Regions:
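Non-catalytic, C-terminal membrane-associated alpha-helical segments of glycosyltransferases
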Residues: 82-151
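Catalytic beta-strand/loop signature of glycosyltransferases that borders the donor
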Residues: 38-51, 59-60, 86-87
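A short, conserved alpha-helix in the catalytic core of glycosyltransferases
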Residues: 1-11, 16-47
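Hydrophobic side chains within alpha-helical segments
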Residues: 26-29, 73-74, 90, 102
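Short glycine/serine- and small hydrophobic-enriched flexible loop segments
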Residues: 8, 30-33, 73-77, 95-98
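Short secondary-structure transition/capping segments
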Residues: 28, 51-54
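Catalytic core of nucleotide-sugar-dependent glycosyltransferases
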Residues: 38, 56-83, 105-121
Length: 151
């Protein structure tokens, strides 16, 4: 359940991640950075046929690429701490080199897919900087310490 007013204050789900994956993570992370509470109920039951609507539109390979693309976009948009940003910048070439040696293309394709949306991610990043009350380190520490966010 979501507080409608806060959902609207956050701008709702970001179309940056369209058509799938990371919308809920993005929304929750932005709420936490604004100092709002986010609750997770591990005992709740949700009935959802896994990828039932997604699979009709997207093939498995496409889903994997979009998920990897959205990982890049999430970091570019939301991770503001310089040390974490630097770590991500360092790891991008390492993932790409690893895929090259394994004759895999997932991270290469996803990276170039993400580059097309990078301007929108960086524009949103500026907005997030203005609204963030807590650092990424503080939020990640809270998530890691608070078992409520873990399954």
């Amino acid at each position: 359940m979501v507080d409608r007013e806060r959902y609207l204050d956050l701008g709702g789900f970001d179309n940056l991640y369209h058509p799938l994956y990371y919308e809920e993570i993005d929304l929750s992370y932005r709420a936490l950075k604004r100092g709002w509470e986010v609750h997770y109920e591990p005992k709740s039951t949700a009935y959802h046929k896994v990828q039932s609507t997604i699979t009709k539109q997207e093939k498995k390979r496409s889903i994997e690429l979009i998920s990897a693309r959205n990982n890049y976009l999430f970091v570019w948009k939301n991770i503001l701490d310089p040390s974490l940003t630097l770590q991500f910048i360092i790891f991008i070439p390492l993932f790409l080199i690893r895929d090259l040696f394994k004759f895999k293309s997932r991270f290469w394709i996803a990276f170039f897919m993400a580059l097309k949306r990078m301007p929108a991610a960086l524009k949103s990043r500026k907005e997030e900087k203005l609204n963030a009350l807590f650092s990424d380190h503080e939020i990640l520490r809270k998530i890691n310490i608070n078992s409520e966010y873990r399954t």
